[in-house]
Amino acid sequence: MHRQSSKSGVALPPVGQGPDACQMLSRAQLGQDPPQRTVLGVLTENEQYRRTCGQEITAIRCFSGSENVFPAAGKKVLSDHGVNEPAKRGFDIYMDDPEQGDRDTCSGKEGIIFEDVYEVDTSMLKSDLHFLLDFNTVSPMLVDPTTHAQSEEATDFGSDVINVTEYAEEIHRYLREAEVRHRPKAHYMRKQPDITEGMRAILVDWLVEVGEEYKLRTETLYLAVNFLDRFLSCMSVLRGKLQLVGTAAILLASKYEEIYPPDVDEFVYITDDTYTKRQLLRMEHLLLKVLAFDLTVPTTNQFLLQYLRRQGVCIRTENLAKYVAELSLLEADPFLKYLPSLVAAAAYCLANYIVNRHFWPETLAAFTGYSLNEIVPCLSELHKACLSIPHRPQQAIREKYKASKYLHVSLMEPPVVLPLQ
C-alpha cells in the first residue's frame, strides 16, 4: 500500500524492517535542486541505524491520531481498534520520599492542576520509541543560517559574563551554591514506569543533532537536558510523550539562550508534525510550571569554560574537554550523581591527560577546592564513556566533534588505562 508524503506529495513505497528499506526518493530524482540538509533517521530504543551521506529516509508516522490530539472536553477517545480504553494520564507527579530531604524536592510541583488529561492509545505503550525528522524537505524556517550565526568560539571567552576576571571567584562561588539547588534526582529513572535509560539516551542524541542542524549554542543543549532531567525527576511520562517533553525543553532553552531562536513552527516541523503547535506550547507551559520558571541554572559547560579561562590550554585540549563533557549528557546514570562542577573538572582532567599527560593543575585545585582524589570517581566514569562511545548506537556527539572546526578530537583514542593509583 502506497501513501503520500505530507511534505513532498510523492507516493512513497512501503517501509521495510531493515535499515536499507528506509529510503525515499531523493530531491534530485524529483527534479528539484535545493541545498542538501542533514538527515536524522528513525531511532529505536535498542538500535540506531546510521546512514551514509546522501541516503534519505522515509518519514514514518508511528503514533496513532488519538495519541497526539487533545480530546474535546467531556468526550472519550476511541482506540484504533474501536475499543474504549480507560482514561490515562500522560503525566503523573512524584511524591518525594521523606528521606530524600530538601535537596531532591521539585520546586513548583505542588498545586499543579491538570485541566486536560491525555488520552493514551495503550497499543503503543510497548512499542519501540521513534523520533521523526527529515531535513531533506522544505523547512518552515527559510532563513539562511549564516545570517545570524555567531562564532561560539569567539564569544565563549570574550563577552561571556560568567568569565569576567575581576569577579571570577565570586561568580564561581555563586554557581557552586546554585548547582545544588537545581540538581535533578540522580536515580529518577527508577520511578519511571514506561521509559528507560536507553530512551533518554536516544532523545539526548536526537537533541544534539537538532542543535547542530539549527546552529544552536552548546549551552542551549546543556540547558535543554537540565530542563528535561528536572522535569522527569518530578513527573512520570509515557514513552509516546517523551519526545514532546524533549522538544519543549529545547524550545524553552533556545528562547532563553539564543539571540535568534528557531520559531515554534520549526520545532513542530522537526518532529514531522507528530505533535501540534498547540500541544508543544502547552507542554512548554507545563514544563515552566514544574520548573517553577527557574531557568537560570549552572551547567557543566559553564564550569568548564571557567576552568579553561582560569588555566588556559591549547585549542585541541579545549575541544577535547568539551567533547568529553558532552558525552556525560548521554547517561543519566552515573553522571547525574555528580555535580556539574565536578563533571567539568573530570572532563578537564581527562582531556588534559590525553593531550598533555597532566591531570589537574594546582591553579584549578585552589580555585575550585577540588583535589584530584575527589575527581577520580567521575574521571573514571568519563574515561569509560570515552572508550565505549565508538561502539554505542548514539553517535551524534562523536560525529559533531569529528568536524574540522573541533580539530577532529572525537577521533583521538584515549589510553586504555589511566594512572590514577
UniProtKB/Swiss-Prot annotation:
Localization (cell): Nucleus; Cytoplasm, Cytoskeleton, Spindle
Residue segments, region Disordered: 1-21
Bilayer-spanning residue ranges: none
One GO CC annotation: nucleus
Coiled coil region boundaries: none
A Pfam family recorded for this sequence: Cyclin_N
PTM comment: Polyubiquitinated via 'Lys-11'-linked ubiquitin by the anaphase-promoting complex (APC/C), leading to its degradation by the proteasome. Deubiquitinated and stabilized by USP37 enables entry into S phase. Ubiquitinated during the G1 phase by the SCF(FBXO31) complex, leading to its proteasomal degradation.
InterPro entries for this protein: Cyclin, Cyclin-A_N, Cyclin-like_dom, Cyclin-like_sf, Cyclin_C-dom, Cyclin_N, Cyclins_cyclin-box
Phenotype when the gene is knocked out: ales are sterile due to a block of spermatogenesis before the first meiotic division, whereas females are normal.
Entry keyword set: Cell cycle, Cell division, Cyclin, Cytoplasm, Cytoskeleton, Developmental protein, Differentiation, Meiosis, Mitosis, Nucleus, Spermatogenesis, Ubl conjugation
Swiss-Prot/TrEMBL GO biological process terms: cell differentiation; cell division; meiotic cell cycle; spermatogenesis
Chief localization: nucleus
PANTHER family from the UniProt entry: CYCLINS
Family per similarity comment: Belongs to the cyclin family. Cyclin AB subfamily.
Function, in words: May be involved in the control of the cell cycle at the G1/S (start) and G2/M (mitosis) transitions. May primarily function in the control of the germline meiotic cell cycle and additionally in the control of mitotic cell cycle in some somatic cells.
Record-given protein name: Cyclin-A1
Organism: Mus musculus (Mouse)
